[in-house]
């Protein structure tokens, strides 16, 4: 969302966060009864735009976040520490948590990482879809979300600088996000982390064999570490069709993935990741106001009301309150 808003500004066609044509805006968040929304400063290291600088991009998107928080203080407020979530909820405000999707924007500098924390960043992926100074990702040849071919990267994971970043992130209480990370990188995090970590937008590889998804072994390891996984609404990560154009994004498929997560790792690990404003295609739940559709699908899949509430907000609230 921050990336889309920044891009619109630079194109001379700014969008209002109050109401726009994106998956997420303030009106839709209110309609969806959101407790907390993570806002990712997204950086594409493959951007060939002349003069593109990953650090500048991240800082400009963080500036978009700051301006949103300043413009709508009665409706949404930032989260820097666990008490902020409770305070915002008590005041009837949505919590906005700043995250980074592409640790490479820090250019391998621990000093920049510390500055990101000071700016409010509380969760970060080590990579997006490009190798950087920190680690290697799981990527599909040619890009995109196509299921085939999709060979997980089991050879290269965290680099020396990546391990340094992990240690400093844990000291600062910036949550390590393993979505996009290679299989080897995931297991490096499992072995070396001392705090719970998240897979903010990943599904089950057993149901959709995409290398961006988690194997059952990974799900169990994440659960054993006290982690959180966010359901991803992207069709290529939900369906098991061999061609992306055939894949569907339906609430029924999301509920199937939730049921598998529950069976393998337990109900307490499941949250909502969405990847809204980072995915395209035909979505049954096509913006954040449509969450009741997913609640209904979960009930049809056999989830109790208590479990639906756990998935929708309690698990994420507990995870962030314990780990920020």
Positions of PLM-derived features:
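Loop-centered beta-sheet repeat module
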Residues: 149-190, 199
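Short, glycine/acidic-enriched loop or turn micro-motifs at the edges of active sites
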Residues: 1, 180-183, 204, 278
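Short hydrophobic/aromatic-enriched beta-strand-loop microsegments
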Residues: 196-202
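N-terminal hydrophobic targeting/anchoring segments and the immediately downstream early-domain regions
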Residues: 1-152, 209-272, 276-324
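Short, catalytically relevant binding-site loops at active-site mouths
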Residues: 183-184, 203-206, 235-238
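Short glycine/proline-enriched coil/turn segments at helix->beta-strand junctions
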Residues: 193-195, 266
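Short loop/helix-cap segments at secondary-structure boundaries that form the rim of catalytic
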Residues: 116, 189-192
């Amino acid at each position: 969302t921050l990336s889309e808003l920044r891009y619109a500004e630079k194109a001379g066609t700014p969008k209002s966060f109050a109401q726009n044509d994106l998956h997420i805006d303030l009106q839709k968040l209110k309609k969806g009864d959101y407790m907390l929304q993570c806002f990712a400063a997204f950086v594409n290291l493959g951007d060939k735009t002349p003069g593109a600088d990953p650090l500048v991009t991240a800082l400009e998107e963080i500036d978009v976040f700051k301006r949103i928080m300043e413009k709508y203080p009665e409706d949404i407020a930032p989260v820097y520490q666990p008490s902020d979530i409770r305070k915002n909820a008590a005041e009837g405000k949505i919590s906005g948590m700043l995250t980074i999707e592409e640790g490479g924007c820090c250019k391998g500098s621990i000093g920049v990482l510390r500055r990101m924390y000071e700016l409010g960043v509380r969760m970060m992926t080590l990579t997006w879809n490009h190798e950087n100074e920190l680690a290697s990702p799981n990527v599909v040849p040619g890009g995109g979300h196509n299921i085939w071919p999709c060979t997980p990267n089991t050879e290269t994971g965290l680099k020396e600088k990546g391990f340094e970043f992990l240690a400093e992130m844990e000291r600062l209480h910036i949550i390590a996000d393993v979505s996009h990370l290679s299989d080897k990188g995931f297991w490096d995090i499992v072995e070396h982390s001392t705090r719970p970590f998240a897979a903010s937008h990943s599904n089950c590889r057993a149901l959709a064999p995409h290398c961006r998804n988690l194997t059952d072994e990974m799900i169990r390891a994440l659960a054993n570490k006290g982690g959180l996984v966010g359901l991803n609404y992207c069709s290529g990560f939900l369906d098991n069709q061999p061609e992306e154009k055939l894949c569907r994004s339906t609430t029924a498929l999301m509920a199937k993935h939730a049921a598998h997560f529950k069976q393998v790792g337990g109900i307490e690990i499941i949250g909502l990741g969405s990847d809204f404003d980072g995915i395209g295609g035909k979505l049954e739940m096509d913006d954040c106001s449509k969450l009741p559709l997913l609640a209904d699908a979960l009930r049809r899949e056999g989830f109790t009301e208590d479990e639906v509430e756990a998935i929708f907000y309690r698990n994420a609230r507990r995870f962030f309150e314990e780990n920020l």
